[in-house]
Amino acid sequence: MRINPTTSDPEVSIREKKNLGRIAQIIGPVLDVAFPPGKMPNIYNALVVKGRDTLGQEINVTCEVQQLLGNNRVRAVAMSATEGLKRGMDVVDMGNPLSVPVGGATLGRIFNVLGEPVDNLGPVDTRTTSPIHKSAPAFIELDTKLSIFETGIKVVDLLAPYRRGGKIGLFGGAGVGKTVLIMELINNIAKAHGGVSVFGGVGERTREGNDLYMEMKESGVINEQNLAESKVALVYGQMNEPPGARMRVGLTALTMAEYFRDVNEQDVLLFIDNIFRFVQAGSEVSALLGRMPSAVGYQPTLSTEMGTLQERITSTKKGSITSIQAVYVPADDLTDPAPATTFAHLDATTVLSRGLAAKGIYPAVDPLDSTSTMLQPRIVGEEHYETAQQVKQTLQRYKELQDIIAILGLDELSEEDRLTVARARKIERFLSQPFFVAEVFTGSPGKYVGLAETIRGFKLILSGEFDSLPEQAFYLVGNIDEATAKATNLEMESKLKK
């Protein structure tokens, strides 16, 4: 982290005059720049091209040095469109990697890859900036303690708990509730952990980014009246951006998150949507730079690029960055090098199911497909582990019996199986939960359920204590006491109707 010198500083103007190059070649988003002998910029240095195009329009393009070619030439990748650039234009070596604004001033705002605000809400305080290229924290700084990151969402905390400072893969198609789940997590970390969130939109649709921003304003995650009270900073590099921007926007978001962790000593949630697009952009840049492609046409440096990003996402003794990454699986092929490389870094997976969404069970997290390396008795304790295993066994048995029920009906099942089905249906409904950010749509107030309450509730259902209660009582409630209260209300309503 550094405090920016002003542009009027004589030291800056001398450096800018000193390190001046000229464009020698332009191939799409890739520029070759010639510098005077002995004035070559370093790899990853930012280069800025300023001037006017043939129509007299101002041009301001930032590039990043990727290769030193020899003969005093460098090859750089542009972070924005290169239309209007001409050979012979002046290029200034900034002498540093790209630096972006960090700190409280970023909350409630939308930035591009260069850290420039793109939400028409005026300039951002850029006195405190940080370079996007950094080393991962040293081993001695890491917090190696295994601890659960409580989200307040029952299905996640019980069956696929998140690790504090871990990485979680979020799998789900369109319309199954990814955005709502992301917003609820942003809301809960702010309330329960006093933390903030950073959302990195990497190579996804501009419309989705806009929808997310509007929904965040509607649900109060972004406070329009007082931006400083917002809980999230947004960084977008969407589908229409050049590959250089899409490849680096993840690092911009990560840099903002690192400041909250290292300087403000907070717990941070970092969302990356979509991690596959980060790999895809790297593949495009690799081809443009003339590297020999590897398996399935991906860049030969795929594992290194992924590792460089993922290793910076971790817990230190000061704070933590817990990352939730949406993973697009091309053609549903989990062996494709992009998702396969991502899986190596994940501690947990949260799989959203269209079947559950169709039943109206939200969050539509699939309890059998979602996994976590944290679900071990030595980490979560015997009680939590046993309860989670029993819940999974009950749901698995219900899944196996569904074909028989569809053909022959419930009456043909044994007494034991009928009891299992009844409990499984209660569990399925109890895994649903009203969200704070969905209050606008559901009309029922959101609920944050602590881990101890979650375990107690499921243990009571499994023990058969609530076999007499209707399954409807367990739908969209918080803890188990609310379910019993709802059952009493339902009973009174049915008596009144009679």
From Swiss-Prot:
Plastid found in the keyword field: yes
GO biological process: proton motive force-driven mitochondrial ATP synthesis
Entry superkingdom: Eukaryota
Catalytic activity, EC: 7.1.2.2
Any one GO molecular function term: ATP hydrolysis activity
InterPro entries: AAA+_ATPase, ATP-synt_VA_C, ATP_synth_F1_bsu, ATPase_a/bsu_AS, ATPase_alpha/beta_chains, ATPase_F1/V1/A1_a/bsu_N, ATPase_F1/V1/A1_a/bsu_N_sf, ATPase_F1/V1/A1_a/bsu_nucl-bd
Record PTM Phosphothreonine, positions in chain: 6
Single GO cellular component term: proton-transporting ATP synthase complex
Modified residues (Phosphoserine): 13
Subcellular localization, as worded in the UniProt entry: Plastid, Chloroplast thylakoid membrane
Membrane topology: Peripheral membrane protein
Chief location: plastid
Reaction(s) the record says it catalyses: ATP + H2O + 4 H(+)(in) = ADP + phosphate + 5 H(+)(out)
Binding site for ATP: 172-179
UniProt keyword annotations, A-Z: ATP synthesis, ATP-binding, CF(1), Chloroplast, Hydrogen ion transport, Ion transport, Membrane, Nucleotide-binding, Phosphoprotein, Plastid, Thylakoid, Translocase, Transport
Function: Produces ATP from ADP in the presence of a proton gradient across the membrane. The catalytic sites are hosted primarily by the beta subunits.
Family from the record: Belongs to the ATPase alpha/beta chains family.
Quaternary structure (record): F-type ATPases have 2 components, CF(1) - the catalytic core - and CF(0) - the membrane proton channel. CF(1) has five subunits: alpha(3), beta(3), gamma(1), delta(1), epsilon(1). CF(0) has four main subunits: a(1), b(1), b'(1) and c(9-12).
Designated name of the protein: ATP synthase subunit beta, chloroplastic
Organism: Crucihimalaya wallichii
